[in-house]
Regions:
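N-terminal carbohydrate-binding accessory modules
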Residues: 22-71, 86, 294
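Surface-exposed, active-site-proximal loop segments in enzymatic domains
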Residues: 44-51, 78-94, 118-135, 347-353
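Bacterial Sec-dependent N-terminal signal peptides
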Residues: 1-26
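An active-site-proximal structural segment forming one wall of the substrate-binding cleft
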Residues: 54-55, 61-70, 88-116, 124-159, ...
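Active-site region of glycoside hydrolase catalytic domains
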Residues: 133-278, 285, 289-310, 331-334
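Aromatic-rich peripheral "rim/lid" segments of glycoside hydrolase catalytic domains that contact
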Residues: 313-365
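Short, solvent-exposed turn/loop segments enriched in Gly/Ser/Thr/Pro and often Arg
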Residues: 75-77, 114-118, 198-200, 337-345
Length: 365
């Protein structure tokens, strides 16, 4: 064999080697830092037709990126994506694809969050998802369809959240469902990032009860944080203490306990039992500690997928709370997603423009 022939063979072998290495290069990870929920559109909304088409458009994702966020969480409901017979609602699926493509065009990562299904709503008194195997199979089928729709998108850019704020009476019911859904998705999408919350509204203090698959690096743990409720949900109409319209403070005692005398027995009991108290930055961090510790033990990234303050309290107090909260997130390497973009806890003012002081806090490096 001539030197020329030997050199040619070596060149071919080297080319094959480098091509193989390139093919085996791991996909870019799904990495996020600060985002916003695009809520009350494909979830928790009666909007349909032209009203739904106009509520969120591609321009909104350009605005979100320009503000400085790096991802969006898009809640979707079963009633929007499928009718009562299980038939797909094509317009809603088309809107979901529009949203994902618009987000990607603006370099925003996306979490598709299955928020409410007919058998499970986080504020319902009872949910048949935990008692009826047929409803669990329906949920599995929803994820078969969503996975088939979404797998066209890069695993580095789109992630799935299995279910928002599971509220099983027994945490093992949620753990079993998580294991089943992950096995199913992994059969077709071994590297897709899956977001998993703890049982009971994704509360930080329920993380010790959560079980996640071992040796699965493509998982993000998620908790929600609205503590203290007397501050974050001041005068929110759906709470049982909405009648309280008095002052709110932070840091310090959120609501003066002497003011309980002016409340109904139900509202006073809620304030006394869990919604009120003395809160400062140190207390907030202690409240988050179980989730932070669990994520460290599991060596998995942690994400606060929802937090926010109803815009009815003094704005300086509101911003002070946001500043402490985001400082804690960043100090503990917790990614976070504000609830929400438009809607009840908005980052936009009445003219549709970003609240400059709020978004500066939310997007600070």
């Amino acid at each position: 064999m001539t030197r020329k022939a030997t050199g040619s063979i070596l060149l071919v072998l080297l080319s094959l080697y480098f091509l193989t290495c390139a093919a085996q290069k791991p996909a870019e990870k799904f990495t996020i830092r600060s985002g916003v929920n695009v809520s009350h559109w494909l979830s928790q909304s009666e909007k349909r037709g032209e009203e739904r088409l106009a509520y969120i458009t591609a321009a909104d994702f350009a605005k979100i990126a320009a503000i400085g966020f790096d991802h969006v969480r898009i809640p979707v409901d079963e009633v929007q994506l499928w009718d009562s017979t299980g038939t797909r609602e094509e317009e809603a699926f088309n809107l979901l694809h529009m949203a994902v493509n618009a987000a990607l065009a603006n370099k925003l990562r996306v979490i598709v969050d299955l928020h409410i299904i007919r058998s499970h709503y986080f504020n319902a008194k009872s949910n048949t998802l935990w008692t009826d195997p047929r409803e669990q199979e329906k949920l599995a089928d929803m994820w078969r369809q969503l996975s088939a729709e979404m797998r066209r998108y890069s695993v580095s850019m789109v992630a799935y959240e299995l279910l928002n704020e599971a509220v099983a009476d027994n945490p093992e019911d949620w753990n079993s469902l998580v294991a089943m859904l992950i096995r199913q998705i992994r059969a077709d999408e071994p590297e897709r990032t899956i977001v998993i919350g703890s049982n009971r509204w994704q509360a930080a203090n329920t993380f010790p009860d959560l079980r996640v698959p071992e040796n699965d690096a493509h998982i993000i743990l998620s908790y929600h944080f609205y503590t203290p409720f007397a501050l974050t949900h001041h005068q929110a109409w759906w709470t049982d203490f909405s009648e309280y319209g008095g002052p709110v403070n932070y840091p310090g005692q959120v609501v003066d306990t002497l003011l309980y005398r002016d409340l109904s027995p139900t509202a006073a009991a809620t304030m006394r039992n869990w919604a009120n108290g003395y809160f400062d930055k140190a207390r907030l961090e202690r409240e988050m500690a179980p989730a932070i510790q669990y994520a460290r033990e599991k060596k998995l990234p942690l994400y606060c997928g929802e937090f926010g303050v109803y815009p009815t309290i003094d704005n300086e107090i509101r911003l002070r709370y946001y500043q402490d909260l985001t400082d804690i997130f960043r100090a503990n390497n917790v990614a976070y997603c504000h609830w929400c973009y438009k809607g009840d806890f908005p980052i936009l003012d009445e003219k549709g423009e970003p609240d400059s002081r709020l978004v500066a806090i939310l997007t600070a490096k």
